[in-house]
């Protein structure tokens, strides 16, 4: 099990008496230990960027500590306000239903603790730049940039029941294509189009060098499934710990906090 990543707040900022509102970074969770280890590293970077704030990692499912456990700990520490930032790339069931339900129960258990849910990471341009960089690192040097127009990239995501959530992945692929000139297609690990279908579409579009770019924060069973389904193409690394990811999480924190202050004014 992975314990909480936390930093004790010490400095009043923006008119707040000590402590500054905590940040609870909520990851999905996975049966694959690589996923929890990666998210622990991600949140360690987030905490290091602003050591004046109490930062903790929680998981929606399958790993500990749970959201309930972390909220209990934050309340016991004496916090009266925490921002809950979903470490989720899409705004689907977990962000819209699962996490809000958990927070509603937590508010009932701790009426003295204000819990403000921040926005998801989403298709932020900074993350798409990181996706490009991960893909470039996997691309043979002789291919890019001289033959960039013949590169085909499958942007691979989890997949959701929500068409709007899946459309966000298509938007990521469009932005990546605009940024690089690469041919792009999308695939999903849990629904269609599959990775093999997406590769076939790229071949039809005359892509000569095909890679899979996982739109995932961490490796796990689903990224392994993608590799197993398409073992003959190069798979780039997941996003993982990254300066851009850290910046985006703190932007979501600040935006959520500003909104909460406006509502209470």
Q: How would you name each of these model-derived features?
A:
Residues 1-265:
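Active-site-proximal alpha-helix that buttresses catalytic centers in soluble enzyme cores
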């Amino acid at each position: 099990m992975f314990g909480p990543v936390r930093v004790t707040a010490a400095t009043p900022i923006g008119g707040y008496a000590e402590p500054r509102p905590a940040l609870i970074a909520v990851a999905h969770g996975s049966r694959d230990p690589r996923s929890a280890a990666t998210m622990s590293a991600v949140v360690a970077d987030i905490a290091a960027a602003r050591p004046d704030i109490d930062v903790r990692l929680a998981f929606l499912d399958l790993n500990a500590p749970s959201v309930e456990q972390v909220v209990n700990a934050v309340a016991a520490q004496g916090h009266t306000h925490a921002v809950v930032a979903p470490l989720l790339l899409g705004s689907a069931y977990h962000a819209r239903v699962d996490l809000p339900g958990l927070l509603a129960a937590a508010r009932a258990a701790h009426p003295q603790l204000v819990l403000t849910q921040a926005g998801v990471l989403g298709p932020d341009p900074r993350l798409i730049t990181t996706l490009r960089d991960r893909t470039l690192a996997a691309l043979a040097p002789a291919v890019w940039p001289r033959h960039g127009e013949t590169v085909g990239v499958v942007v691979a995501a989890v997949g959701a029941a929500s068409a709007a959530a899946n459309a966000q992945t298509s938007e990521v692929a469009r932005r990546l294509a605009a940024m690089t000139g690469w041919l792009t297609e999308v695939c999903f690990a849990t629904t269609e189009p599959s990775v093999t279908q997406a590769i076939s579409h790229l071949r039809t579009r005359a892509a000569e060098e095909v890679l899979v770019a996982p739109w995932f924060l961490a490796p796990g069973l689903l990224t392994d499934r993608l590799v197993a389904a398409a073992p003959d193409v190069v798979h780039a690394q997941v996003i993982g710990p990254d300066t851009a990811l850290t910046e985006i999480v703190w932007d979501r924190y600040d935006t959520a906090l500003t909104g909460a202050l406006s509502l209470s004014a």
